[in-house]
Amino acid sequence: MQLSVKVSRFDPDTDSEPRLEPWTVEVEEGARVLNVLDAIHSLDPTLSYRSSCRAGQCGSCAVKVNGEPALACTEEAADGMVIEPLDLPVIKDLMTDLVSGISSIPRINTCDCGIIPKQEDIERIKPLRDCIECLSCVSVCPAMKVTDFLGPTSMRSQMRIALDPREPGNRVREAISQGLFTCTSCNRCWRVCPKNIETPGKAIEKLREIAN
């Protein structure tokens, strides 16, 4: 089938601002956004975008489709769609700088305590451990745009680690210093999460309960 789309193009070395470039390509029925990008790339190899697993498991292909974050490999392509980068610093075209966002996600501390998590510990952690670090939630977080809030995926990670009996640190105190109480509970991070992680209710509100 034939699809006409618009794709954001931006090269910081030559452009002062992004522009939407129109393309019409042939793709198979049921094609995903990533298939459209591949088709455009076959015609113009200078188009920059990321992809890896092509199965919705790595998060590397996250972009905005008609203004909303989505994984390019799982989002169905549609005629007239507009494909743009996430609201993160743009390296080129649809490629964004993920380093600062991913490097700020808290990691569990090394523990020589010999503690083995029980099944109930694992069950409590499960709703928070499916994150694929696509940073879609970071892209839409209004609090991050106006404060020093470290972001929803960082809070999700803090709560996940706080629930781990092997963790020796005070994760609630860390979360407070990272802007825990600046979250507005707008739920936008939950709505755009490709893994449907309920970060506001399962992480941020829980951390606030412990803090109080």
Task: List each model region and its residues.
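Ferredoxin-type iron-sulfur electron-transfer modules in oxidoreductases and energy-metabolism complexes
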Residues: 31-43, 87-88, 94-129, 133-212
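Iron-sulfur-associated redox domains of electron-transfer enzymes in respiratory
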Residues: 1-96, 142, 147
